[in-house]
């Protein structure tokens, strides 16, 4: 499950003249003790994106997880793309959170870079769940148009691929339009990406999930060395 999303991203990254980066074997594929849970990771870079990572967790019928985060280069003030998609097989429940995660919360910045998400939410009403907005901090790295779905198998089978494709294509089109930085300079962009990683290192809900499957030692290393690598950077 979710392999089609991985393939879709790989195709798009390839079209951006992106290339896969080498990562350590312990992150490339990792099994828990009885191999009931298997996690696979990919890391890419392209001329426009300094880091684009993909994570797939296969927990059989219990749980399936897909995550991707794209960091633009430090010379671009574009938001960070973030997507978390979870399928709980036993309960037949889908949870999806997709957003263009803003570097700042200034209204004009949000309107310029994030408001187009509203068109996707309008087209797919199941992915416009305002009741779940308490699961994230709207004053930090989330936009007012964050896409949230707490759905079922129908949403998984019928809607998810279309929503994800629209989400990715729209984001890539933002970059292709070559927007001029209006709000942040290079140093401010780098600082805000560092702050994003530090915030995510502390707040990412996947921490508990990974610890329960793979243990605390591996999870801490994984989050620090693969997911949020700018967490250890010092802001002067």
Swiss-Prot record:
Alphabetic keyword roster: Oxidoreductase
EC number(s) reported in the record: 1.3.7.2
Gene3D superfamilies: 3.40.1500.20
KW Oxidoreductase (keyword) present: yes
Catalyzed reaction equations: 15,16-dihydrobiliverdin + oxidized 2[4Fe-4S]-[ferredoxin] = biliverdin IXalpha + reduced 2[4Fe-4S]-[ferredoxin] + 2 H(+)
GO biological process, one term: phytochromobilin biosynthetic process
NCBIfam families: PRK13246.1
Protein name listed in UniProt: 15,16-dihydrobiliverdin:ferredoxin oxidoreductase
Lineage: Bacteria, Bacillati, Cyanobacteriota, Cyanophyceae, Synechococcales
Annotated gene: pebA
